Each structure stands twice: as structure tokens, then as C-alpha cells.
Amino acid sequence: MPCTTILVGKNASYDGSTMIARNDDSASGHFTPKKFVVVHPEEQPRKYKSVISHVEIDLPDDPMGYTSVPNAVDGEGLWAASGVNEANVGMTATETITSNPRVLGADPLVTYQPAKDGKEEAAGGIGEEDIVSIVLPYIHSAREGVIRLGSILEKYGTYEMNGIAFQDQNEIWWLETIGGHHWMARKVPDEAYVVMPNQLGIDKFDLEKALRDQEKYRCPCEEYADLEYMCSADLKEFISKNHLDLSMDGVLNPRDAFGSHDDSDHVYNTPRAWYMLRNLNPKTKIWDGVNAEFTPYSDDLPWCMIPEKKITVEDVKYVLSSHYQGTSYDPYASYGEKEQRGAFRSIGVNRTDFLSLIQMRLGMEKDCNILEWVAFASNAFNVLVPFYATIDTTPDYFSSTTREVTTDSFYWVSRMIGAMADASYKSSIFHIERYQERVMSKGHQLIGKYDALLEKESDAAKRMSLRHQANQEIADMVKKEASDTLNKVLYELSNQMKNAYSRSDA
């Protein structure tokens, strides 16, 4: 999917959490209703079949339950997208990335071939539709996630290029697919953050270390903390055989070897990375002007950086909502060169289906340390809502999305607020800003309230009940605030109707 991702290492976050967040965006002209649910072990298939590629995969018989943000309308597969499992491992998938003809010629994508001219159909590989569902219920650490997905890629292949994040309380790993069957993964440095548009991103990779460490891939973090890179066992031979290393000094740059630097990247991808880095490291580099070290068109923007200050949930939400505020590229701007407005693809685009931010907090019991923050529709106009992730069910307002447009669904209310506020931007934006601040503030307040209650309760059943109670109270608060904001932006837009007339009845 055309998404945007940010990953925050535990020493780069404001409270020692690992954080992974991704905008899940539909293709241009499409909008995909989503819902936030829990998948129980008995609901997980034992034989998985992909709708898109028809690939069939036998799954282990001992799945864990997990949260999920699947498609709400049947017909195109699950697209579970993001979630946390019972082992407190988080995952978001996928960030569609790019490649180049050299890679795709050497290891072609595995695409579905329908039956034709007397030949039987040939199943394709795995893709975004499948990845969370066939990986997350079976892994007990971020490293295990990399290993399981890597082995599936090698066996079944993939029909698309993807980036996937895995997270536990100690580490975040980022895996990128290479061609149809190859892959590499890099640990996010604890003190750094990573930004990812729809482009292969890893720019440094110690291939020799990755290959030396193969026997230690399965070691827990506590046993081998120095694991930084993982990859396909034959990646070195694959690179050499196909002359993929373009470096002059012999130091592999994966972005040059496996990625793209197309004209389309310079309006669709690199500007997004530039804006996020510029926002979180405004003084570290020169981002603007004739002396800029990096511009929206730069192909060498860093994959990761150490932030100038600790990164908060609010920071993540802001950059993932951005439409280039403060620059001449802002489509809503009334300043700067008019021709530049909307020149680049916004991060907070109109066709965002949802945003998920998984926050794994330190120093807390494992049944309440993980918060899954969820937002629906365009981030420029929506709100990010926290929920305890170790749960058996989710509130109806977030889980009952259907094809029908209704104010009983937070997904549809968020879509309506976004469309109306966009069309009445100047008069509605202050309603949106107040809505966002109120929900974020009250969300923090309610989580703090229930954290304190949970700290005093030791009974497991009562603790589960408290988490459900917290999530429902948060959902009720959000429903009230969203309804109020919908009313306000509807009023503002109604006043701008073309058939308005300033004179009233005598």
C-alpha cells in the first residue's frame, strides 16, 4: 500500500518505549473501510489461502491471539495490517517499497498466473494481504518475526516489494524484500528513529557481519545484543552474480543496489522523508535554501537519525499528518509560490485508511504496558486514540465498521469530518485543532487513571476487566468529541454552499 512509516528506538522516545507507526493508505481514488478487532486463536485458519495470489500455506496449530486492523468489507482478503500478539510482539505490514529492473530481472516477483490455454493456474507468492496473518500469531520476539517472514519469503516468494516492521520491548527490526525471494533486515538503533516513504530505504548494511551472525539469528537479545543485521543466506552470491553492488569503494549501499532513484520518487517519496527528518532534526542539517545539504529531491536522505530531542506520540502523529506545513509545498497554504502548492505527495493524504502506533512502555506489567493508538481516515483531520492492547475485544465504535456510511462507526465519522473540514479548511481548521488536542489530552488522562488502578489490582480477571473498561471509556469519550466536531464542521461547510444568500426573511 502507498504508506508512510516511522520507527522510534527506545532511547530516542520520551519514555523509553519502542514505537512503530504507519499510515495505511489506499491507492489513488480508493478508500478502504477498516476496523480494529481482536483475532482469537480459534479464529485463525490452519490452512491459509490468499485471495490475490491463491497461494496456500499450512500454518502452525498453536496460534496466539492478536489485535488487527483488517479490511471491514469482505472480498479482497484480510489485510490485517497491524497488531500486537499475546507474546507482546508488535508488527506493521506493509510499506510498499521500490526496486529496479536489475533486481527484478535477477529474481522476478512471483505473480499469480490464472489457468489459460490448457495450463493449470500457478499460485503467486505472499503479499501485504497475507503477511500479518501468517506471521504475527506465531512469533515471540521481533527477531523471530524477521526469521519467520524471511523463511516464508524464501519458500513461497512475493509478488510485490515490501518493508515490514517488527517490535518487542527491547528492539525494532525493519525487513525489506529484495526481488521475489531475497530479503535483508536491520535493527533500528536504540538511540535513533527511522522514516520510510514508499521506497527501499536501508542505506547501510554490513553484509559480512550479517552472514557471520547467521547462527545467532535465533539468540534472544539478552544472549546476543550485538545482532544488527540479518539477510538471506545467499544474498552475497546473489549480489555478486548479478553485479548489483554499485559502490566505487566496495562499501555496499543497499539503496543503490536494490532500490530506485526515479523521477517519480522525487515527487512521491523523497519529499516525505525530507519533511519528517527536517521536522525532527531541524538544526542538525541544512534543509532549505541554496546551501541545503538535503532537499526534497535528495536520493541520499538518511535512513535513520538521532533526534535532537526525545520523540513523543504527538511528534509521531504530527509528522504522519503532515502536508508540508510551513513550506511553499503545503496545498492549504496562502503564502509562497502558488505553483508549488501540492507539488509533492502529502504524508497526511486524503486516502489514509488508518494510522496505527504501537507503544511498548517500560517498567510495567506485561498485560498493560502496550498501548495501540488508532486513527482512521486522513490524518490531517483525525485523532489518535490509545487503547490497551492486551484485550479480548475492542469497543463497537471502532470494530463495527461496515460498507454502510453511518455515524455509529468511528471510521465513517472520521471520513466525514475529514472531507468536510478539507472543503471548509480556513473556517474549520481551528475546530480540528481543538478536537485533536482534547482527544489526545483526555486519552493520556484516562490511560493514566487506569494505569494507577491496574497498579493496585493483582487479580488477572479483574485486570482484564479494567483494561476493557478503560478502552470503552476512551471510546465513549472519542464518540462524544467526534460527534461534536462533525456538527461544527458540517455547520462551517453548510455556510459555504453555493446557494447561500445573505438576506433572511423580512
Q: Predicted segment positions?
A:
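Short, well-ordered beta-strand elements within core beta-sheets of diverse protein domains
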Residues: 132-138
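A contiguous strand-loop segment
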Residues: 2-128, 148-291
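Short, charged, surface-exposed loops that flank catalytic or proteolytic processing sites
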Residues: 138-144
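Histidine-centered catalytic/metal-binding microenvironments
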Residues: 438-506
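Substrate-recognition/cap regions that form aromatic- and gly/pro-loop-enriched pockets
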Residues: 324-456
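Short Pro/Gly-enriched beta-strand edge/turn motifs at strand-loop
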Residues: 61-66, 146-147, 334-342
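Glycine-rich, aromatic-lined ligand/substrate-binding cores of catalytic
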Residues: 227-363
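Soluble extracytoplasmic regions of secretory-pathway and membrane proteins
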Residues: 21-34, 96, 175-177, 319-332, ...
